């Protein structure tokens, strides 16, 4: 989903201020606004590492470093909510190897 759609999502617990996400226009369509999370980084094995931007009771929300949209994944079960680990990116941004969701809110 795009950032504008995410901002309208109800019943989410934000981990970061959405104003801290860097917005940019999609190269293929300047009317589409995408975003980057400055906390994301590419590790030495070639995997993107991303951090949650929000949660709801069942899901974790992250900014996809491949397409610039917000993706959601299962949060896991209480009490641990083990959402971290490798995930497929679920986007059509060409061939990519997904990303690793990290626990925490690192800057």
Predicted segments with their positions:
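Glycine- and charge-rich intrinsically disordered segments
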Residues: 1-37
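Short Cys/His-rich Zn2+-coordinating modules
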Residues: 27, 37-53, 73-76
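Short, flexible, mixed-charge glycine/proline-rich loop motifs
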Residues: 51-59, 80-85
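Short functional micro-motifs and their immediate structural scaffolds
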Residues: 69-75, 96-100
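Short metal-binding segments enriched for Cys and/or His
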Residues: 80-107
């Amino acid at each position: 989903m795009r950032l504008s759609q995410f901002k309208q999502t109800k019943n989410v617990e934000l981990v970061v201020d959405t104003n801290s996400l860097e917005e940019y226009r999609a190269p293929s369509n300047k009317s589409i606004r995408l975003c980057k999370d400055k906390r994301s980084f590419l590790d030495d094995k070639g995997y993107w590492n991303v951090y949650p931007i929000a949660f709801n009771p069942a899901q974790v929300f992250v900014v996809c470093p491949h397409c610039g949209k917000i993706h959601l994944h299962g949060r896991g079960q209480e009490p641990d909510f083990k959402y971290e680990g490798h995930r497929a990116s679920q986007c059509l941004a060409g061939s990519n190897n997904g990303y690793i969701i990290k626990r925490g809110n690192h800057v």
